[in-house]
């Protein structure tokens, strides 16, 4: 199964890109590899965190996380990113974004 990866946007801005673009190039490349694994259907490092939002956990650094929702079986919506230190706040923000995404689809 292959998945399509898209970024959630608010007013033309991507919260995921805002976070990702501030990372150093080596870290960004490593995180991109994890995202590409999801694109090829490998969700082994992902777990649900509530209300339809999932967390992609990285096995390096300060516990990097990428938050996403699944729109159907093959569309992944990137909602944001962060690390273990701000995990609770990032999860809450991702859940709010996911709810706005679903509401806008209706």
Regions found by a protein language model. Give the residues of each.
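Short beta-strand motif preference
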Residues: 65-69
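Basic, Lys/Arg-enriched alpha-helical interface segments
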Residues: 1-62, 72-76, 83-106
């Amino acid at each position: 199964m292959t998945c399509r990866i898209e970024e959630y946007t608010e007013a033309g801005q991507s919260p995921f890109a805002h976070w990702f673009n501030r990372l150093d190039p080596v870290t960004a490349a490593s995180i991109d590899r994890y995202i590409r694994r999801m694109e090829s259907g490998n969700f082994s490092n992902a777990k649900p965190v509530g209300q339809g939002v999932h967390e992609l956990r990285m096995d390096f650094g300060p516990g990097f996380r990428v938050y996403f929702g699944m729109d159907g079986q093959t569309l992944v919506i990137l909602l944001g990113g962060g690390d273990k230190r701000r995990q609770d706040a990032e999860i809450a923000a991702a859940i709010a974004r996911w709810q706005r995404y679903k509401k806008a689809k209706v």
